[in-house]
């Protein structure tokens, strides 16, 4: 039996340290970001490579594909060598697999990696979970601004590596790291709806909000946007055809192009808003309406003529749901 030492920094992880030849001091630089890597190899190979002084490579954590097992190799307080010029302020972890093969990115791996990120977010470094990248995956390098604190190797400046690449599901990862905020539910048949700044002020930075339009007994809901303005390509409104973020996505909107008029296929629409850490805008104004079937039961009144008839006669009744009807 091989004795495995447990990490004292992250309980679920195994502690298997890299040699001192492969990491160094942060020299006082504060930790402020997380780097997501794909090793282009196996879990065991990543551990072995970081323990080889000839590699001049290390990472704080390695995540296994099959079951999400994690090995810690460098203390978070130390500078691992994984993202070049951006090493001093980042914590890096490698994920087993290859960027061209999505089968390596298993649910177990996503969940284990996200749990690790959640732990680091709560460790006092000042890394907000909301600042996880959630945009489309891409090939090549794609530098993302400093507002985004949890992102891929390919998203940092001065890089040539392109991991985790086109097959990493950033939206999934964002949702695993971030709990859904409390939903504000609107049940009136119609009304006005504004961003958090109201009618006349901007929304705020670092927002994630959910609003559910679900009028009582409605068969459809319509949102009519009369104005719309968010920070283009940074602050987004998502509209879902249903009562959760797992419902079909109707659209994702940013900038000054209005969503226009949106109608649900059922009795609910969910609206989600996400803003980044800088630059706000006027937001939006919406009038919403809904179709609610008439649920008032019909009532009938019969006039008693007190007059016995031996021939054809007329009976008149009034239905609240329709016009008066006369029957013979």
Predicted regions and their residues:
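Short coil-to-beta-strand
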Residues: 84-95
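Residue-level detector of short, conserved catalytic/binding motifs and their immediate flanks
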Residues: 32-34, 57-59, 91, 148, ...
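Low-complexity, disordered linker/stalk regions enriched in Pro/Thr/Ser/Gly
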Residues: 292-328
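Basic/polar, cationic surfaces and motifs that engage anionic cell-wall
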Residues: 1-17, 23-27, 99-181
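N-terminal catalytic cores of peptidoglycan-degrading enzymes
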Residues: 1-84
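Extracytoplasmic/secreted cell-surface and envelope-processing proteins
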Residues: 43-47, 100-105, 159-162, 232-233, ...
């Amino acid at each position: 039996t091989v004795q495995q030492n447990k990490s004292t920094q992250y309980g679920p992880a195994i502690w298997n340290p890299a040699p001192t030849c492969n990491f160094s001091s942060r020299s006082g630089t504060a930790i402020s970001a997380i780097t997501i890597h794909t090793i282009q190899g196996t879990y065991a190979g990543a551990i072995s490579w970081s323990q080889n002084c000839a590699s001049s490579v290390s990472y704080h954590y390695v995540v296994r594909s099959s079951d999400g097992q994690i090995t810690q190799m460098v203390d978070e307080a130390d500078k691992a060598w994984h993202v070049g010029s951006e090493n001093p302020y980042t914590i890096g972890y490698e994920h087993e697999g290859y960027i061209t093969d999505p089968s390596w990115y298993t649910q177990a791996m996503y969940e284990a990696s996200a749990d690790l990120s959640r732990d680091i977010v709560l460790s006092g470094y000042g890394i907000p979970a909301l600042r996880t990248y959630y945009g489309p995956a891409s090939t090549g390098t794609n530098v993302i601004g400093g507002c985004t604190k949890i992102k891929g190797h390919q998203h940092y400046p001065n890089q040539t590596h392109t991991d985790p690449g086109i097959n990493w599901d950033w939206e999934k990862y964002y949702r695993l790291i971030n709990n859904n905020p409390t939903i504000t539910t609107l049940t009136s048949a119609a009304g006005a709806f504004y961003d958090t700044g109201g009618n006349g002020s901007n929304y705020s930075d670092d927002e994630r909000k959910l609003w559910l339009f679900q009028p009582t007994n409605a068969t459809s809901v319509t949102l009519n946007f009369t104005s719309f303005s968010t920070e283009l390509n940074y602050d987004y409104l998502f509209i879902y055809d249903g009562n959760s973020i797992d419902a079909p996505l109707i659209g994702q909107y940013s900038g000054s192009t209005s969503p226009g008029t949106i109608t649900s296929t059922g009795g609910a629409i969910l609206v989600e808003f996400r803003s980044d850490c800088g630059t706000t805008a006027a937001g939006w104004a919406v009038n919403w309406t809904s179709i609610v079937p008439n649920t008032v039961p019909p009532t009938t009144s019969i006039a008693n003529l007190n007059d016995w008839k031996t021939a054809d006669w007329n009976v008149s009744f009034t239905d609240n749901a329709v016009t008066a009807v006369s029957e013979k």
